[in-house]
Amino acid sequence: MPDIRVEVVYALSERQYLRTVSLVVGSTVEDAIKASGLLELRPDIDLEKNKVGIYSRPVKLGDKLNDGDRVEIYRPLIADPKELRRQRAEQAKK
């Protein structure tokens, strides 16, 4: 059975992680993340909480991968973007 190659990425403000893995055709997003070793390397990644995507498009852990996909693990937001914009606008008025 032919293999597919995918990249798994996770970015922090101070460091980015990029792993290339080979998987069998029919593998899922979750399979790629587990094969990348990032879950062991970064225990702060919780697949129950962190959203995932392929090329900035949100996907589910069970979605099947294609050759050349880039699986992205997103960090949870620590602040509401709308509220941050409001605060910056108020500061700019001063």
Swiss-Prot record:
<dbReference type="InterPro" id="IPR005346">
    <property type="entry name" value="RnfH"/>
</dbReference>
<dbReference type="InterPro" id="IPR016155">
    <property type="entry name" value="Mopterin_synth/thiamin_S_b"/>
</dbReference>
<dbReference type="Pfam" id="PF03658">
    <property type="entry name" value="Ub-RnfH"/>
</dbReference>
<protein>
    <recommendedName>
        <fullName>UPF0125 protein YPO1103/y3077/YP_1053</fullName>
    </recommendedName>
</protein>
<dbReference type="InterPro" id="IPR037021">
    <property type="entry name" value="RnfH_sf"/>
</dbReference>
<comment type="similarity">
    <text>Belongs to the UPF0125 (RnfH) family.</text>
</comment>
